[in-house]
Amino acid sequence: MKIVLIGAGNLATHLGKALLEAGHDIMQVYSRTMESASRLATRAGGAPVTDLRAVRRDAEVYIMAVKDSVLPELIPQLCKGMPESVFIHTAGSVPMDVFKGMALHYGVLYPMQTFSKEREVDFRGIPCFVEGNDKMAKEVITDLARSVSEKVYAMTSEKRRRLHLAAVFACNFTNHCYDIAHEILAKQGIPFEVMLPLIDETAAKVHDLSPREAQTGPALRFDENIIREQSMLLKDNPLMRDLYERLSLSINQFSKKKART
């Protein structure tokens, strides 16, 4: 397919490369800065542009891999006057109807993964969740997703919002906890790498056990002495201390749900 890629961030970088490897024609890469547009265009093909007025109007598909907050501003400028094209955004929490009244054929292709530009990922194994407003959009978006991923699922906007919420807990919040652990260790001169086997095993366990079955630690047992002592170690950081206590309470309450089932 002939594609124009709008955006040059982490997701756009990996998606652009995957589309190129799948045999698609990346005609242009748009970004607000020429540096970003050129960097991705070098890797994914196509011409870099920084002016929306310079975006070609003969592509089959326009993929908007940009910040969620940019879409309402970007869509009206880009979609008008191209009734034959399919417009796609890649956001987890933005409904498909953000295109309504602006484009004729539109939908969503949401790859659920955490992306960093310089870290390679196997796009074939990334779950991609798709939605289209009509038969043409559904077929184009599904075919596009299947060309880069072996795991493609149809999903409504409402379900995708919940999926993205779950992903925030499973990925973003978890990584923030790694950051907190890193800070605690750094103050004691302990390298973060000592945590890696623990982190790896924690992630590996949920391939075989449910998260609730895999839960361990003082909060599960509600060992009040340890919880109190560890909470006191955080007395100089009220936000971190509050987070520790709330997570401990949540873990204990979830464990009681398990006991009742």
Feature annotation, model-predicted:
Residues 34, 38, 42-120:
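Rossmann-like NAD(P)(H) cofactor-binding subdomain of soluble oxidoreductases
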Residues 36, 40-43, 120-165, 170-207, ...:
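Internal alpha-helical scaffold of NAD(P)-dependent oxidoreductase catalytic cores
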Residues 27-31, 86-91, 109, 128-130, ...:
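Short, hydrophobic beta-strand segments that form beta-sheet elements in well-ordered domains
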Residues 1, 24-28, 58-62, 82-87, ...:
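Short active-site oxyanion
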Residues 186, 200-261:
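Interdomain hinge/lid region at the active-site interface
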